[in-house]
Each structure stands twice: as structure tokens, then as C-alpha cells.
UniProtKB/Swiss-Prot annotation:
Pfam families: Aminotran_3 (PF00202). Coiled coil: none annotated. It comes from Staphylococcus carnosus (strain TM300). The gene is rocD. One of its GO terms (molecular function) is ornithine aminotransferase activity. GO terms for cellular component: cytoplasm. The lineage of its organism: Bacteria, Bacillati, Bacillota, Bacilli, Bacillales. Belongs to the class-III pyridoxal-phosphate-dependent aminotransferase family. OAT subfamily. This is Ornithine aminotransferase. Its cofactor is pyridoxal 5'-phosphate. Its main location: cytoplasm.
Amino acid sequence: MTKSEDIIKKTEHYGAPNYKPLPIVISEAEGIWITDPEGNKYMDMLAAYSAVNQGHRHPKVIEALKEQADKVTLVSRAFNSDNLGDWYEKVSELTGKEKVLPMNTGAEAVETAVKAARRWAYEHKDIEPDKAEIIAFNGNFHGRTMAPVSLSSEAEYQRGYGPLLEGFLKVDFGDVDQLKDAINENTAAILVEPIQGEAGINVPPEGYLKEIRKLADENNILFIADEIQSGLGRSGKTFATDWDGVKLDVYILGKALGGGVLPISAVAADSEVLDVFTPGSHGSTFGGNPLAAAVSIAALDVLEDEKLAERSRELGEYFQDELKKIDNPVIKEVRGRGLFIGVELNEDARPYAEALKEEGLLCKETHDTVIRFAPPLIITKEEIDDALERIKKVFS
């Protein structure tokens, strides 16, 4: 038995079966490359679901981590830490919003946005108590906690977890008329992934986000975007909503906000929205801790200094164009923006993900028939060409 096999056996024995990973063990990683205990190297084409946009162990992020770890790592929000204000300022300037609320995981940030939207609706829109509604979209994925699960349109994500939370409506992604019909006097917010990730990298019709912005303005509704996966350069722009040139009322950020090192998330909005929270009404022991703030500042500096959004846009266009040239009837469609790419197949995608793993390329199927290619944004054209050769070998 190899070391990897022994590790997998132990993991499956002691761990709850809530994941079905590819049969590989990762012991080291740097840049876009991953190494298993046997010394085999693989190209990372998943980037931890876009949490590793800056690449594995980016030197500037690791330097910030080590430097801060030698000072102070956690004080809780019972006290002020010396770098939290700097991080707030960084995220505020990035989003153009007045206030920031720090959390840890993306799901926590979604829960925060839902709570903020509901309280805002009661305090600023005078919706009757306990009647506020939030509109989401079929195919959405906002996390695994109860609000995101209740928002979901996937029966399997909800099975056995009832009673679900009330006050959530779902409409088809990209259908303006359905959205118009769903809006009523109790609508507090519209929550959208500007590119649906887990649903198979679904890009909305051109101008759709502008229509949402218009409807939100006309009806005094908060426009909230979950940019946890699609944001911070992944789509080829800082935020995927930038493709339609729209500004949001609420940004939900996560994943790459932590530079591939720590779980760091945030909700950014103007004072009218986030000032609905009062001391004790919401919080997190670890949210905005000194270590997280230092790492996230460095992670955002890397995104800006290395122009990773522009890099994603240019290389993503090239990658997609080359994928579209692969002549195989099993490939139904290649779609995406930047280095956020989905290859939809006419059959189950899992065997192809496993075959790509054997060729030294790590990716993952999503929504059964879609292979997601979302490498760290530091990838080079030469490395993309290398990946394309491996992909062509599997699909030849």
C-alpha cells in the first residue's frame, strides 16, 4: 500500500462522507503545481474553488502570514487590533462601499448579508415584521449553512434539513420577466451570483445584471452579489459584475480574499445597510482577526500589483478559444469568462476528471456534466499550453 492509499483509507475511515474527492493526496503545493506523497506533480486547475487565485503559497502572502504570526494572531473583537482598520480601508476602496463587516467562510458572509438585508428592510423600507423576502436564482450556490441551503433550488442540498427558512423566492437565472413578476412590496433584496459556479459556470445574458440594477432602483430593493467565487479577478475583471458595469448595494467576498492561506470573508455595503447592526446583534470571534487582516491585505496587494484580473481576461480568452477547437462530439459547449471556464459534456464528467488526473491535471466535475477549469491566476501561457496538451490527450 502506498502512502497515499494509506492516507485515503484513514481519511475515509474517520471522516464523515460529505465529500467525494478524487483519489489523490496533496502533500506540497507551490504556484500552480501540486505534489503527492510519492513525488508525482500535478497542475492545479481548480485553485480550491477560486480560493487560490494568487497561487499556492505566494511569497508575499506567506511573508505577511509569518510576520504577523510573530506579533499577535487572535484577540477577538472584544478589543481593537492594529491592522483591522487598514484592512477595512483596503476592502472599502476596492468595492467603493463605506463599511465592511468581516467574517470567515463564504457561507458566513452570505448569512450576514441576508441578516443585513432583512433588518434594512424593516428599518428603512418599512416592510411589515417577519414579511421580508429575498429573491435568488435557480441553480444558485451560496454555501452549506441554513440560509444558503434554504435559498438553494437543489433538492439534494435540502433533503433532511427541514424545516427550511422562509422568505426566499427563486426565479430562473437570466429571465427578466420572471424576476419582474416575483417582485412585490415585501421584496427586500435580490441575491445573485454574477456567474453561477456550481451550476456549471453559467454566464448571464448580456445586460442582465443591468436589468437587475434597474429593477432594484425602481423598487427600492438591495442588489446583492455573491462574488465569493467569481470576484477578485477570477472572471477577468475585479468583480464579475464589472462586465455589465453595474455597482452593487452589497458585495459578498470570500475565497481569494484569504490568499489561499486562511478562510476570510467580508460583506461590504454603505452605512445605511451595515449600520443596522448594533453591538451584540451579529459577530464572529475570528472574523477580522489580526492574522486574517495581514494575510488579506497582502492577498489584495498581489491581485493589484500583478494585475491578475487583466491576466485572467487575456489568458482566459486564449484558453477558451483553444478548448473550443477540440473536435470531439462529447463536448457540448465551452463557456465562461476569464479563467472561470466550464466545459459541458454530453455525458457524465467524472470519468474525464479522473482521466485528466492520470495525465497530471487536477480539476473537478460540477453539476454532473461540466468540467470546471479555474487555475490560479498566476498561470502562464506556457503552462496553459501544457494543460491543453493533456486535455487534448484525454479528449482525442
